[in-house]
Amino acid sequence: ASMFKHDHYMDNGVRYPNGDGICEQLNETKCDAGFSYDRSICEGPHYWHTISKCFIACGIGQRQSPINIVSYDAKFRQRLPKLKFKPHMEKLKTEVTNHQNRAPEFEPEDGENLYVKLNNLVDGHYKFHNLHVHNGRTRRKGSEHSVNGRFTPMEAHLVFHHDEQTHFEPTRTKLGGAFPGHNDFVVVGVFLEVGDDGFGDEPDDEECKHILKGHHPDNNENGNGDNGNNGYNGDNGNNGDNGNNGYNGDNGNNGVNGNNGYNGDNGNNGDNGNNGENGNNGENGNNGENGHKHGCRVKKAKHLSRILECAYRNDKVREFKKVGEEEGLDVHLTPEMPLPPLKYRHYYTYEGSLTTPPCTESVLWVVQKCHVQVSRRVLHALRNVEGYKDGTTLRKYGTRRPTQKNKVTVYKSFK
């Protein structure tokens, strides 16, 4: 997430590292300078700090995000709050635009106010800022965070910004105060799986008009029933506690092909490849860290899937637009749509940064343990969004920052 409408990095030319792999630090000071996800150029994620002095934290920061979360190293904290919004499950009018070579963002229209308040975790009220979804260069490895070296095809981010105009509480975090200063953002991260079963046929243009306006016959993804009748357990009302067996890939096996789970690009785990959990049911299945006690049920987010499919396919979002020439697409959604069921909202939390320049180190991350499944068509549509003037799409370089190596303390709401 970024607070800026960035230029396109190609507008100012492309730089390459010298023979020693070093990029020259520019004298630029703009905070909306363009950046890239192409790892071979000086505008890419390994060299963001050289683009502008405003981006210096990207290179020397001590709490940079994303990170690989090691579940058994995370510290359990009692009385961490449930993740709830005020007003509860409010449907918002949002506008989504093409963000060039970055993830399209669903931003609330003026007058739309929704807050998250996390007592016992951080002071202050945080106002919904945007929803966006990150993807990778490959279909399997698109999440920015990983857990025990394991990635998922996408990661949704719900971004909240401290509303200092109406709520004057300081943004102090109650996690031990490892870092000075305040957390101006709360970002909720959700690991997104992809699947085919239960998502219906691809919506046509006429259906998309109704979907984007908030009309849907099965709009029940925001309920809480254990048996799926009211909601967070999929639109078919039958996935609840009697549904599928947690994180068993798209076809009920361990991972996409029933092999070693979601183990990165080539069956390895993480940006540097290890063997991690080796295809067991991991943290989202019945055999997670502690069996049933804090297991997960993978929600099929059918309604959200159709919203994202329709939005990413729409020409206003899919076609490349220069800054200042964007056309907004109106979309009705609720920020709870990407989240797991309320009873399964176990999470990891740590003090980190924005994952795009200027990499500001003022983010409290709330990363959901349990995964959510969307249709495979969502991933296809997002990867086909144009990010470049020549029609090159987001599939080429993705929109994920590599995991960062700095050491931060991670806490968790579950044992």
Swiss-Prot record:
Bias kind Low complexity: ranges: 220-289
UniProt-annotated glycosylation sites, renumbered to this chain: N27
Main location: secreted
Cofactor dependence: Zn(2+)
Tissue localization of expression: Expressed in the mantle.
Enzymatic reactions: hydrogencarbonate + H(+) = CO2 + H2O
SUPFAM superfamilies in the record: Carbonic anhydrase
Binding site for Zn(2+): H132, H134, H157
Compositionally skewed regions (Basic and acidic residues) per UniProt: 207-219
PROSITE patterns linked to this entry: ALPHA_CA_2 (PS51144)
Sequence repeats mapped onto the chain: 225-227, 228-230, 231-233, 234-236, 237-239, 240-242, 243-245, 246-248, 249-251, 252-254, 255-257, 258-260, 261-263, 264-266, 267-269, 270-272, 273-275, 276-278, 279-281, 282-284, 285-286, 288-290
EC number(s) on file: 4.2.1.1
Location of the region described as Disordered in the Swiss-Prot/TrEMBL record: 201-297
Disulfide pairings: none
Classification via CDD domains: alpha_CA
SMART domains xrefs: Carb_anhydrase (SM01057)
Location relative to the cell: Secreted, Extracellular space, Extracellular matrix
UniProt GO MF annotations: carbonate dehydratase activity; zinc ion binding
Region described as 27 X 3 AA approximate tandem repeats of G-X-N: spans on this chain: 225-290
Family note: Belongs to the alpha-carbonic anhydrase family.
Additional information: Two hypotheses for calcium binding are proposed. Either the Gly-Xaa-Asn repeat domain bind calcium or sulfite and sialic acid provide the necessary negative charge in the N-glycan to promote calcium uptake.
Subunit relationships: Homooligomer; disulfide-linked. May also be disulfide-linked to insoluble organic matrix.
Protein name: Nacrein-like protein C2
Organism encoding this protein: Crassostrea nippona
